Amino acid sequence: MFDKRHRITLLFNANKAYDRQVVEGVGEYLQASQSEWDIFIEEDFRARIDNIKEWLGDGVIADYDDDDIAQLLADVDVPIVGVGGSYHLAENYPAVHYIATDNHALVESAFLHLKEKGVNRFAFYGLPDSSRKHWAAEREYAFRQLVAEEKYRGVVYQGLETAPENWQHAQNRLADWLQTLPPQTGIIAVTDARARHVLQACEHLHIPVPEKLCVIGIDNEELTRYLSRVALSSVAQGARQMGYQAAKLLHRLLAREEMPLQRILVPPVRVIARRSTDYRSLTDPAVIQAMHFIRNHACKGIKVEQVLDAVGISRSNLERRFKEEVGETIHALIHAEKLEKARSLLISTTLAINEISQMCGYPSLQYFYSVFKKEYVTTPKEYRDQHSEALL
C-alpha cells in the first residue's frame, strides 16, 4: 500500500541560517523516510503570506516565532507543525503541535562553557522588548535564572534594534555599556549577530578579547566566522534536528494518527569553542597587553623584540612575568599562536592548505607540515578531514 502523495507548505524565511537548517532537516527526513511529498517553498526562500489560505495544500510546517504567520494559521483546517523557541510557561505555547529549540539549554550551554573557562562574572547582551522576539526574551529570562541559581551577579543590556540609520548610535551605546563591565566578564549574546556587534565595539575600544572580556553567541552562524577579527565561540542549535522532528510529526498527522498536542524540546548540538572564549585568568597588565599583541600579529612574522617594543619593558622583566602568569616563554607563545591560527583556519574554512601556511607566516608548506605534525601527530589534511566544522 503506497502512501498518498501530499502537498506540503514550508513557511520559513530560509535566507536566514537557522530557518535554512530547519528546512534542511525536513529534507533529511524526506530522504530517510522516502515520503511522497511535494514541497512548496518560495523560490527566493522568503515566507510570503499573501493569500496564504489558498495554497496551503495538505499540511504545513511553519516558523511560529513569526507572529504574523502564527496568527494567519490560527483557524486553518490542515495539519500544522509549528517550529520555534521554547517557553518557560506552558500557557505561552501556541495551540499547535510544536517543535522547540530549548532556549534555557542554549543559554545554559554558553554559561557552563564560560564557567569551565574560569569566568565568574557574567553579562547578557539581548534584544529590546520592542523587537517582539519572544525567543530573545526567553533567553534573557534563562540567563537571569541561571545566574540567580548559581549566586552570581548577572548584568543585562538589551541594547537597541539596529538599522543603517541608527547603527553608529547603537554601537556607541553598546560601547558605553561594555566600559562599565569589570575585567574578566563573560558576555553571552542572544545571537551571533549581537555577539559580532560586541566584538566590533571591543576592537574600537581596544578592549582585548578574550583577555579582558569573553564573548559567546548562539546560532553558530557561518558568516560570523569571517566577519570579525576574533573568531567567535557559539552554541550550535539543533535546527536540523528540529526540521527532521517536525517532518516526522507531520507524517504521523497526515496518516491520521490520534495523539495529544505535542511539545518536543530539541537541545543544542554543542558549544563550538573558538578564540573569543579562549580565556586565561591573567592579572598582569603587561602580560595581557603582550598576549593581545601576539594574538593580533603572530602570523605577521613578529619576533620577541616586536612584543617588547609594543609593551615597552625589558626582555628579562617580561619573560619573568610571562613565566609567572602563563608558564611559557614569549617565543613559545608566538609559536603556539601561529599554530592555533592555522588549526582554526583548517577546520573553519575551505582555504587551500598552502594558502593557510602562507597566511600564518610559515616559510614553506613542508615546514608547516613538519611543525603541525609534531604538535598534533597528524598532517594538516588529515586533521581537517577529521575535525572540519563544515560537517555541523
Locations of the language-model features?
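Bacterial carbohydrate/catabolite-sensing allosteric modules
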Residues: 1-59, 69-310, 319, 324, ...
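Short helix/strand-capping hinge loops at secondary-structure junctions
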Residues: 297-302, 329-330, 379
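Residues within the helices of the helix-turn-helix
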Residues: 305, 331, 354, 370, ...
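Recognition helix of helix-turn-helix DNA-binding domains
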Residues: 312, 328-332, 363
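A secondary-structure capping/hinge motif
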Residues: 322-329, 371-383
